[in-house]
Amino acid sequence: MSTPDNRSVNFFSLFRRGQHYAKTWPMEKRLAPVFVENRVIRMTRYAIRFMPPIAVFTLCWQIALGGQLGPAVATALFALSLPMQGMWWLGKRSVTPLPPSILNWFYEVRGKLQEAGQALSPVEGKPDYQALADTLKRAFKQLDKTFLDDL
């Protein structure tokens, strides 16, 4: 669930972790006021889908209209970097340890899952946002939607 040393993460593995975190995080509207992940994941998916064609279009358009090549390439590279920035942020967030207020909430959700008879693996080290995403995804699948009301 979580790595013992969250700070020793390879730069390129952050992108993989970001993809995994985006797939794991439950996209529930009730979590949106508390966590920024819903907006970041939605915008990153949007950027993955639309930024490459926009980059190609702006590059071709500026070249066709006799624009300079330098600014055209810079604009295209910026547009192409937006999805990567989103994935990098998500990967960095996934290995960030939970703050104390969310940590208490994390243990309460785990307790509700255990009360419901779900077998959970023990948490290794300090829980991070990836562990929270795994727990929330499982809670939304296994528990009724009212489990958030009690917390």
From Swiss-Prot:
UniProt-listed Pfam families: DUF412 (PF04217)
Source organism superkingdom: Bacteria
Ranges that cross the membrane: 46-65, 69-91
Localization: Cell inner membrane
This protein's GO CC annotations: plasma membrane
Keywords, alphabetical: Cell inner membrane, Cell membrane, Membrane, Transmembrane, Transmembrane helix
Topology relative to the membrane: Multi-pass membrane protein
Similarity annotation: Belongs to the UPF0208 family.
The name this protein goes by in its record: UPF0208 membrane protein CKO_00500
